[in-house]
Amino acid sequence: DSIPLMAILFKPFHSILPEDFQYIGIYLLLCQLLQTWMAWLLLGAMSIHKPGARLAGTLILGLAPVWFFRWVHPALCSHYVLIGALWIYMGSRKTESLSPWIWRQLLILWISAYTHPYLGGMTLALTFAWLLRLWLVDKRWQAWQSLVGFPIAASIILLNWWVIGYFGVSSEGMGTVGLGEYTLNILSFFDSLNSYSTFVPSLPHMPKQYEGFAYLGLGGILLLLMTLVLRFRAKEKGVLHGLWPLWAFCGLMAVYAMSTDIYVGEFRLLKYSWADFIEEKAQVFRATGRFVWPLYYLVL
């Protein structure tokens, strides 16, 4: 896939660049730097200020296995927009003025539209979660403000997709190959696919479920278990208060990621059907397993 963001940036220099010039390496480095920076900001927004803890958390998020797994598909390495959207969700609750955060959210939306359609769709969903939080949790916005925000956010994504030319591709050209196959396995958070862990073996999965790769890493798994124990013992709401809109949207995306055949390893736990109009629209995002990424970073 192309990376419209980089193509537009380098277009003015086309006449002076060599014929074999490519920006893949530049963009991968940029993604790594931005992902690390967004992770640092996110942890600060979560009141993690001790340098050692914040640095460790930044490294875990910045060097996430799910990001390295996408190196063969550079346009999909733009996970910094997802972590950036999480930062806005967490950080905006601490400030009196929402104006700077609104502009940041608009910027994240705009950038995501120029990276990859999958990431644009995920970022839009995270924006919807933020708008719900402002209305239903923080009570900082009235209902009409958030309800107006939904179409505005969607328009930013759709308008920029139209500018790029995504709507010039017919659905016939997209086909249905992979729909219901490139999915998320329930065990994906613990499945290293053999290549991403020295200690954790690959778990059973269906042949094409690599698109739902979501391995947390051994450190991430241990931290998740420790966090669950500590949260069970804790009585205060703390920083997790007000996360239900985020969990709801990330959970819905994870359900979509599993598609209509839900597997635990190689065992099919559940099979159901989508309505025809949903299946028709889902052809655009037929590698549904990728939609686990927002939940992945939320869990991590």
Task: Map each language-model feature to its residues.
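Periplasmic/ER-lumenal interhelical loops and adjacent helix-loop junctions
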Residues: 154-231
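Membrane-interface coil-to-helix junctions
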Residues: 1-34, 64, 73, 78, ...
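Hydrophobic/aromatic-rich transmembrane helices and adjacent perimembrane loops
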Residues: 218, 270-300
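Membrane-interface helix-loop junctions at the exits of transmembrane helices
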Residues: 55-72, 159-169, 186-197, 247-284
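Hydrophobic alpha-helical membrane-interfacial segments at the cytosolic entry of transmembrane helices
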Residues: 139-164, 176-181, 244-252
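Membrane-embedded helix bundles of polyisoprenyl
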Residues: 29, 33-46, 51-93, 98-134, ...
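Membrane-interface helix-loop-helix junctions at transmembrane boundaries of multi-pass membrane enzymes
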Residues: 138-147, 224-269
